[in-house]
Amino acid sequence: MKQLVERFLSYVSIDTQSNPSAPQCPSTEKQLNLANQLVIELKELKLADVSVDKNGYVMARLPSNVDYDVPAIGFVAHMDTAPDASGENVKPQIIKDYQGETITLGTSGEELNPTQFPDLKNLIGHDLITTDGTTLLGADNKAGIAEILTAIAILQANPEIPHGDICIGFTPDEEIGRGANLFDVEKFNAKWAYTIDGGPVGELEYENFNATSADVICHGVNVHPGTAKGKMINSMNIAAQFQLMMPTDETPEGTEGYEGFYHLKSMESGVAKTELGYIVRDFSREGMAERKAFMQQKVDELNEKLEKGRVELILTDSYFNMREMVEPHPHVIELAKQAMTACDVQPDIKPIRGGTDGARLSFMGLPCPNIFTGGYNFHGIHEFITINGMKQAVDVIVKIAELNALNNK
């Protein structure tokens, strides 16, 4: 467990925040700092086929230790952290034997309160790693990286545990939706894989949102305010009218489970032009089609009211629900469930209210459900992880590798 924690703390000390505004891959050069460190560690573990390409994708392989054919499987995690909060100068706190108290996050004035974060009530006796309240932690997804490498080290140190080829992949830019864009599935050469990018212990996910970006562009006319009567058209007022036409109960803060939403995420405004940036989510293709049609209907209604085509809608699909690509391969899910049960972990199968690299990879021919890391409150200063949960993730990875070999003997 010490080795696991040391790896994790080493990784979170490296700022790898991605940048959605940068077109290149990786979107930030600093992601390569972690990629290069991981290459060194993979070579120290004497793994085969260790590589990092110009875009920051890291790959390696632990060769099979059995003399019969076993399907190669993969484990994938991402190196970048979310743009939502700073990932620079992360100062983790380790809370030993948590007993239900409110945790003070450094000197920031922020805290983890069990009333606000009730998951803490289920973690009595656990060792926690938190932030100091000024940055995110980076458990999403550096915990996954640490867990994968620790599991590989355990397999190497215990050759009596049978396993086939284990393929390892670490990706850039997952948090900005591009993690799988340049992933070389053929080079990776696994039959299926698992992203280690989930939350609390037991999470096993093979459904995710269908995702679309919706840009609503409102055009106005700017005239000096002193002579504006009958001439000025304020695009911000048009944008406000459009937002008021959207359902107030179908937002992230008002939905859960399999419910989709519209989320106004950004706005760039001026009198002459205002752009509203929405993300639209739904678990079914039919539901997504209805949401797109609804937005277009509201744009058309507003344009008719304004008597001029002053509102545009640009829809861009981001990713799709991997369920349709994973369900034809039920053994992929059954193996993960079998491994969790063998490790005294209760599988908690639920939809991902978001996306992972695995969603894109599944549509690229690599079925790739998602497994827990043991972390909570990703993307913000209240992010934390349990060391106990990290250890359980390692155990499950090792057991998946072992059972895959035993099941194919």
From Swiss-Prot:
Keyword Hydrolase annotated: yes
Cofactor remark: Binds 2 Zn(2+) ions per subunit.
Subcellular location: Cytoplasm
Cofactor annotation: Zn(2+)
Active site positions: D80, E174
PROSITE patterns: ARGE_DAPE_CPG2_1, ARGE_DAPE_CPG2_2
Keywords from the named record: Aminopeptidase, Cytoplasm, Hydrolase, Metal-binding, Metalloprotease, Protease, Zinc
Annotated positions binding Zn(2+) 2: D140, E175, H379
Its EC number(s): 3.4.11.4
InterPro entries with a match to the protein in the record: ArgE/DapE_CS, Bact_exopeptidase_dim_dom, Peptidase_M20, Peptidase_M20_dimer, Peptidase_M20B
Annotated positions binding Zn(2+) 1: H78, D140, D197
Family of the protein in this entry: Belongs to the peptidase M20B family.
Protein name, entry field: Peptidase T
